[in-house]
Amino acid sequence: MASTFNPRECKLSKEEGQNYGFFLRIEKDTEGHLVRVIEKGSPAEKAGLQDGDRVLRINGVFVDKEEHMQVVDLVRKSGNAVTLLVLDGNSYEKAVKKQVDLKELGQSRQEADLRDENVAPVMNGGVETWTQPRLCYLEKQGNSYGFSLKTVQGKKGVYMTDIIPQSVAMKAGVLADDHLIEVNGENVEDASHEEVVEKVKKSGNRIVFLLVDKETEKRHSEQKIEFRREAASLKLLPHQPRIVEMKKGSSGYGFYLKAGPEQRGQIIKDIDSGSPAEAAGLKNNDLVIAVNGKSVEALDHDGVVELIKKGGDQTSLLVVDKEADSMYRLAHFSPFLYYQSQELPNGSVTEVAAPTPVPPEVSSPDPTEEVEDHKPKLCRLDKGENGYGFHLNAIRGLPGSFVKEVQKGSPADLAGLEDEDIIIEVNGVNVLDEPYEKVVDRIQSSGDNVTLLVCGKKAYEYFQAKKIPIVSSMALPLAIPADSQGMLAELEYNLHEAKERAHSTASNSSSNSEDTEL
């Protein structure tokens, strides 16, 4: 029966920095990993991909039953060339209806035998998917979480034990013999029992664990597979992000997007009664995480507004309320990862891109640590007549680029750059692992201004030692230029036009926030 269906092998190749030119997504009430939005003249179109194709294999690995983000990750990690085995939409739906073993499509028996000798065990028609690591959020009731910690002879790390029935720990999803990987976003795999106990005590009345159950750990160990924190299950977390779909009305969407000097990110304010925003379930003080499938955690106010405008008459927002934002920050996870475990509604897309992690909440500091030193800096540079006024250096054979010879009074100096600052991001893109030449090219090709996330040497070493990813939301918000102090800008646009209006230019105004009606 399988022979009546003819999958196609599409070999895609691209230049460094180029996209393949298609979206890979899942849709509600539709099975399979779908190919959508193929760009004209792109590698995807040239390779023969068609809208509605279902991806069966990536570089020979059967992926039809895999988690969507694992499939996306396989494409992303393929580098500049990838081979996709696809089946057109109609054939795929017929094959599923006839209960055809999709794994047999496109391979001979000899090929199947060879693969079976060299790949992981097969289960349910695909490469066996081990249970994911999972996040568990515990909020103390009384004096106890309801668990104990133990070490196991001959094993590295700390494990959960003595889970009290109906306790906070049990209700949060903690299991006996779970291996503790992280405490509030900090890796503890190499920590001693005493160090982990101390971290739990210091956490106060709430804590987030990244845990791996006994069977999962055993299988990963046997297969020598490393745990990927971005693949962790978020399903047990009590506060979740929300996907809000809206269509613009005659007066716009009916909400304001605001950001102030003390506010991280962009928040929803002043939702109009009876507006599309209210009908869609948007709430005041919601924090915007993504717009139309793209993370905006590293974007400034204008960047977020521009993405919403590009959506035309409809938009999809991923938002979190204060409780969810607080919990995800405590876990040091980005709410953007919520897309991993969701079947996105029609019109939403998951791009082949890495999500941005979020820093943990500020907890009670150790009095012996200089906490203020452990912050990255966001620096916006406007090019002068003689350039930006600094040199970019790198050490051969070592990752990372760093700042040298910052000229006094230059745009770099005025923006806060200092000698030895390590470049983490260029215009929101992490460049820590990129070669020196590519970092230089990113800065040079950014035009007359560039935004850099940098970290001093001492702070960088601290974050590396703690295994804490460095991201822009850890930094203080960008300073507002002196010539714009006291000005409140509001952009208002509807179906017909976009216009700007200044509310006030009074020098004694107390508001430095950005405020955009949508």
Swiss-Prot record:
Modified residues (Phosphothreonine): 451
Quaternary structure note: Interacts with PDZK1IP1 and ABCC2. Interacts (via PDZ domains 1 and 3) with SCARB1 (C-terminal domain). Forms a heterodimeric complex with NHERF1. Interacts with AKAP2, BCR, CFTR, SLCO1A1, SLC22A12, SLC22A4, SLC22A5, NHERF2 and SLC17A1. Component of a complex, composed of PDZK1, SYNGAP1, KLHL17 and NMDA receptors. Interacts (via PDZ1 domain) directly with KLHL17; the interaction is important for integrity of actin cytoskeleton structures in neurons. Interacts (via C-terminal PDZ domain) with SLC9A3 (via C-terminal domain).
Keyword Repeat: yes
Gene3D superfamilies, alphabetized: 2.30.42.10
One annotated GO biological process: positive regulation of protein targeting to membrane
Pfam families for this protein: PDZ, PDZ_6
Annotated PROSITE patterns: PDZ (PS50106)
Modified residues (Phosphoserine): 108, 148, 192, 250, 334, 348, 507, 509-511, 513
Primary residence: membrane
InterPro entries: NHER (IPR051067), PDZ (IPR001478), PDZ_6 (IPR041489), PDZ_sf (IPR036034)
Low complexity bias locations: 507-518
Membrane topology of this protein: Peripheral membrane protein
Lineage: Eukaryota, Metazoa, Chordata, Craniata, Vertebrata
Organism, scientific name: Oryctolagus cuniculus
Name by which UniProt lists this protein: Na(+)/H(+) exchange regulatory cofactor NHE-RF3
Subcellular location: Membrane; Cell membrane
Primary role: A scaffold protein that connects plasma membrane proteins and regulatory components, regulating their surface expression in epithelial cells apical domains. May be involved in the coordination of a diverse range of regulatory processes for ion transport and second messenger cascades. In complex with NHERF1, may cluster proteins that are functionally dependent in a mutual fashion and modulate the trafficking and the activity of the associated membrane proteins. May play a role in the cellular mechanisms associated with multidrug resistance through its interaction with ABCC2 and PDZK1IP1.
Transmembrane segments: none
This protein's encoding gene: PDZK1
Family: Belongs to the NHER family.
Disulphide-bridged cysteine pairs: none
Tissue specificity remark: Highly expressed in the brush border membrane of duodenal and ileal mucosa.
One Gene Ontology cellular component: plasma membrane
